[in-house]
């Protein structure tokens, strides 16, 4: 899906499957700040509709403001944040002290988002997507 793609409103397990299928085909592209994206799309969101953000929350200082704005407009915001710090640790040798500092910085970013009213999921590399999403659905 790209910014212009959307799914028609629906409910239930069928809609959940449609969402998961659409997310499976998503590929990152562009470098537009999240707040610019949410500002341009907010007119298409019904008041109170859930908004799902997949982001490492790194390198874009507009993420906290975008989340605050969405929550302030009455949206239920969920942030699924793949842990690039832990992934990087799996594939390279990050010195322990550097890892601890990066991990703490990441935790502070996620805590800020949670404090803004978003449900935040710290998605670890060893966790299946379905496991992470179960945290959202409350299973």
Predicted regions, residues:
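Exposed, interaction-prone extracellular/peripheral surfaces
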Residues: 4-139
């Amino acid at each position: 899906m790209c910014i212009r793609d959307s799914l028609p409103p629906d409910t239930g397990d069928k809609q959940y499957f449609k969402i998961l299928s659409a997310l499976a085909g998503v590929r990152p592209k562009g470098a537009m700040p999240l707040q610019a994206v949410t500002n341009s799309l907010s007119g298409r969101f019904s008041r109170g509709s859930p908004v799902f953000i997949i982001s490492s929350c790194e390198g874009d200082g507009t993420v906290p403001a975008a989340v605050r704005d969405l929550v302030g407009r009455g949206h239920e915001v969920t942030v699924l944040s793949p842990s690039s710090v832990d992934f990087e640790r799996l594939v390279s040798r990050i010195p322990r002290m550097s890892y601890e500092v990066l991990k703490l910085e990441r935790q502070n970013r996620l805590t800020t988002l949670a404090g803004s009213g978003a449900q935040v999921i710290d998605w670890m590399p060893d966790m299946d997507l379905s496991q992470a999403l179960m945290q959202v659905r409350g299973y």
